[in-house]
């Protein structure tokens, strides 16, 4: 029998409920508001009183309204049809909700239960299976979508029967499994899983051992992110966080992209809706939307559902990872999620931490980032979830609690700088603050030595040192004037400008420059370092400036030319003559 309760207090979307039976933290309940059932989640239990956060507007709610507890946590439906879909934070399918405004208490089914999928069995009767083992597969777009033993199954099962190849709906029975007690359990293509619990179905979780290509030079060359790695992009408003994330989403070497628009402005999400269905994936030649799921919880949607949206997105990624696929999760912006946590913590009158954020903010963010990673599945294949979040610190202050907490959890840090954005040096990632801890991993060094070239990490560090020396020279020139410093200061400054303009800066709206393969990045960095290793002797700083400006112009034109085209080699020849 379900536990029931009545509303005893309301503070915005925090509601206190007196219950008549046992309830658990994170349990889902429905509050009855004049016939409209509003979903809520238990966040604290104290004796007979439960504090619940409501995922809808509580306008019109009053003391005495009835509440019914479901006895389950917030769950997502997992099955064929997740890709190309647009959901809100509670996994309501927004494509089937046609009104301009979403009505309170209106919840839709995330999957199409009428559509038939072409099923091909993988397992055989008599096979021994455990949770997350593959039973069969259906084609979802061009991806092989594995139908698995539900993650909630515990212990070993024997496949009693499995249906033959054919077209079936997601609700039809595809297999019957027998558990260790001899009981038969039916399996369909759909399973449910609570979003706040990490999906376990794998053998081990090793350290990442290869990088994920994004086509963005400032990431792949200077601060690479590993496949199954974590990174975050903090920066003030208008610095290009969203454009950089969109570039990674379009070009990232991943099978599945999940974008969680968590508390961002609606127009940025609309941009994805309009662009992605038309854009072609450079890796497969198919439409980008075919491999993308969007979890859309914009700034004008309920604040409480922001937390649900990031967990829903991560659970969908973990589901596809269990199929042996490479997944990329982009959350924009995790600051909004942290603000939702702060709002709820303050309403519950908990002890505040720094800037009134919850005291356990660091632990919450770390636990979430820990769900990403590369895994070895039970059958020996590998899957990965790579997570990149953006952080919007108030006033661009990178010392605020959300940035500091995320820094502890993420392995890559891409700090966007206001002054670089003001100078239109995009992407505005500042090299002196940004880092990738993966460059210290022996596995990653070995991978880069094999796939790019021997001693690649040393070359990257050499380029970073050029930028550092150029920054120091620039400060001295600004203080003492052009004539007040030795010529070597001018040369160091212009060498750093060369690295900046040719390697760090990239045009996200140019068809050629937007996507830069690793092979091309290797060629360009080698060329730039070859130029910078030479000794130059100029009569005065104006000659130095003119020489490097002409050189930068030729190299920029190379970036806009198709790799290894006649035009590309012509510019290359011109550069060689200039430095001869």
Language-model regions, residue ranges each:
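P-loop NTPase catalytic core
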Residues: 221-222, 228-549, 564
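P-loop NTPase nucleotide-binding/switch module
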Residues: 97-140, 145-152, 169-229, 244-247, ...
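Short, surface-exposed secondary-structure boundary micro-motifs
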Residues: 20, 34, 72-73, 91, ...
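N-terminal accessory targeting/assembly segments
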Residues: 1-103
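C-terminal amphipathic alpha-helical interaction region
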Residues: 539-580
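Short beta-alpha junctions and helix-cap segments that line functional grooves
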Residues: 39-41, 54, 69-73, 146-147, ...
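Short, compositionally biased
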Residues: 43-49, 80-91, 142-166, 184-199
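Short histidine-centered loop motifs in beta-beta connectors
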Residues: 54, 59, 119-128, 158-167
């Amino acid at each position: 029998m379900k536990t029931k309760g009545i509303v005893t207090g309301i503070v915005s979307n925090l509601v206190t409920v007196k219950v008549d039976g046992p309830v658990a933290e994170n349990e889902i309940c429905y509050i009855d508001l004049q016939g409209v059932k509003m979903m809520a989640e238990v966040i604290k239990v104290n004796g007979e009183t439960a504090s619940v956060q409501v995922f809808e507007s509580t306008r019109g709610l009053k003391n005495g309204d009835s509440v019914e507890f479901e006895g389950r946590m917030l769950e997502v439906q997992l099955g064929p049809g997740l890709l190309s879909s647009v959901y809100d934070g509670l996994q309501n399918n927004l494509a089937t909700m046609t009104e301009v405004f979403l009505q309170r208490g209106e919840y839709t089914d995330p999957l199409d239960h009428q559509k038939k999928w072409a099923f091909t069995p993988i397992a055989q009767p008599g096979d021994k299976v455990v949770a997350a083992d593959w039973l069969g597969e259906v084609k979802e777009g061009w991806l092989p979508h594995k139908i698995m033993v539900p993650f909630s199954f515990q212990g070993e099962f024997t496949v009693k029967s499995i249906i033959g190849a054919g077209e079936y709906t997601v609700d039809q029975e595809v297999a019957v499994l027998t558990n260790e007690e001899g009981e038969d359990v039916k399996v369909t293509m759909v399973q449910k899983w609570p979003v706040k619990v990490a999906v376990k179905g794998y053998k081990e979780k090793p350290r990442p051992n290869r990088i994920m290509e994004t086509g963005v030079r400032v990431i792949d060359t200077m601060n690479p992110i590993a496949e199954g790695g974590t990174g975050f992009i903090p920066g003030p408003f208008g610095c290009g966080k969203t454009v950089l994330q969109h570039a990674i989403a379009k070009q990232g070497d991943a099978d599945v992209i999940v974008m969680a628009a968590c508390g961002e402005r609606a127009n940025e999400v609309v941009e994805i809706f309009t662009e992605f269905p038309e854009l072609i994936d450079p890796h497969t030649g198919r439409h980008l939307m075919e491999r993308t799921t969007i979890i859309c919880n914009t700034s004008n949607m309920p604040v409480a559902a922001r937390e649900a949206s990031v967990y829903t997105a991560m659970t969908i990624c973990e589901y596809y990872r269990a199929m042996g696929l490479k997944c990329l999760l982009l959350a924009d912006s995790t600051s909004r999620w942290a603000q939702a946590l702060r709002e709820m913590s303050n309403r519950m009158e908990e002890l505040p931490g720094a800037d009134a954020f919850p005291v356990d903010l660091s632990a919450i963010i770390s636990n979430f980032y820990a769900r990403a990673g590369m895994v070895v599945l039970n059958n020996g294949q590998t899957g990965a979830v790579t997570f990149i979040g953006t952080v919007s610190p108030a006033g661009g202050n990178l010392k605020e609690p959300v940035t500091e907490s995320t820094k502890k959890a993420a392995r890559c840090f891409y700090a966007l700088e206001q002054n670089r954005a003001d100078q239109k040096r995009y992407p505005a990632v500042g090299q002196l603050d940004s880092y990738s801890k993966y460059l210290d991993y022996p596995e990653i060094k070995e991978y880069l030595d094999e796939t790019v070239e021997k001693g690649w990490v040393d070359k990257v560090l050499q380029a970073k040192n050029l930028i550092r020396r150029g920054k120091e020279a620039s400060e001295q020139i600004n203080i003492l004037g052009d004539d007040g410093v030795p010529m070597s200061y001018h040369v160091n400054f212009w060498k750093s400008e060369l690295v900046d303009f040719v390697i760090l800066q990239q045009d996200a709206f140019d068809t050629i420059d937007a996507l830069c393969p690793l092979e091309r990045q290797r060629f360009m960095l080698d060329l730039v370092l070859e130029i910078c290793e030479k000794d130059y002797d100029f009569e005065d700083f104006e000659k130095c400036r003119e020489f490097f400006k002409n050189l930068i112009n030729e190299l920029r034109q190379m970036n806009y030319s198709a790799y290894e085209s006649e035009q590309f080699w012509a510019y290359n020849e011109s550069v060689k003559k200039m430095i001869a």
